[in-house]
């Protein structure tokens, strides 16, 4: 059984027991979160596709960790000027473990 849900402007295909890295959620480690915007649920041959969401379906998850991703470097070179500008960015994320899918 797996489901596709939406969080942080992205869609994630998950199954029970899977650990997923999402955009930062303002939750503490160990808290439970429910995602109601489930777009599709598949259980063997039984497929439920929402328009746009499956009514009554939800994905339940537990927050495992909060953290920051790898650094992304942004470099802007100005040709023939011996000048450049560097900038870095580390995006915050939340890791959640999927504990249940209810359809």
UniProtKB/Swiss-Prot annotation:
State whether it acts alone or in a complex, and with which partners, per the record.
Part of the 50S ribosomal subunit. Contacts protein L20.
Keyword hit for Acyltransferase: no
Q: Know the name of this protein?
A: Large ribosomal subunit protein bL21
Tell me which domain of life the UniProt entry assigns to the organism this sequence originates from: Bacteria
Q: Name one GO cellular component term.
A: ribosome
> Would you identify the family this protein belongs to, as annotated?
Belongs to the bacterial ribosomal protein bL21 family.
One Pfam family of this chain = Ribosomal_L21p
| TM stretches of this protein | none
Q: Which UniProt keywords apply?
A: Ribonucleoprotein, Ribosomal protein, RNA-binding, rRNA-binding
PANTHER family per the record?
Answer: 50S RIBOSOMAL PROTEIN L21, LARGE RIBOSOMAL SUBUNIT PROTEIN BL21M
One annotated GO biological process = translation
What does this gene product do?
Answer: This protein binds to 23S rRNA in the presence of protein L20.
Q: Which GO terms describe its molecular function?
A: rRNA binding; structural constituent of ribosome
Tagged with keyword RNA-binding: yes
The record's SUPFAM superfamilies line, in alphabetical order, gives: L21p-like
